[in-house]
Design a protein with these regions (language model features):
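Conserved sequence signature across two-component system core domains
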Residues: 7-8, 34, 52
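Alpha-helical interaction/dimerization surfaces of two-component signaling modules
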Residues: 16-24, 43
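A generic structural motif
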Residues: 25-30
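Conserved Asp/Asn-Gly motif in the active-site loop of CheY-like receiver
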Residues: 31-38
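CheY-like receiver
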Residues: 38-130
Length: 131
């Protein structure tokens, strides 16, 4: 089972992703949900996850900085950005982080399905190559 965290400062987004999306279909366990990047990184400093689903603009630490720090600690972590911002500086930041996807709010679950399927494929491929 893959382990994932969700990080978004909007309670409705956190609730929607946790309660209404079918993570179990992809054998993904959401182990924690956070409202800001700094608190999420405190968790990541001690706990490995396979997938980071994060907003970009948040208090205390933005999603790009969170992703950079997470990638420094776990180079194989997969990242999906979810944001209401269409500014190219955020898109470039996501590209630099080699994110699996950048999904605009409000989240279309078909788009999220495609991104999550890519994550599962990438992790399975990595695990097969290690064997």
């Amino acid at each position: 089972m893959l382990r994932a965290i969700i990080v978004d400062d909007e309670q409705m987004v956190r609730h929607g992703l946790l309660s209404y999306y079918h993570w179990d279909k992809y054998n993904i366990e959401i182990v924690r949900v956070f409202a800001d990047g700094a608190t999420a990184f405190e968790y990541l400093a001690q706990n490995h996850v396979d997938l980071l689903v994060t907003d970009i603009v948040m208090p205390r630490m933005n999603g790009i900085e969170l992703a950079q720090k997470a990638r420094e600690k776990y180079e194989d972590i997969k990242i999906i950005f979810i944001s209401g911002y269409t500014d190219t500086k955020y898109l470039w930041g996501a590209l630099k982080m080699n994110a699996v996807d950048y999904i605009f709010k409000s989240v279309d679950f078909d788009e999220l399905d495609a991104a999550v399927e890519r994550v599962v494929y990438m992790v399975e491929k990595r695990n097969t190559e290690r064997e």
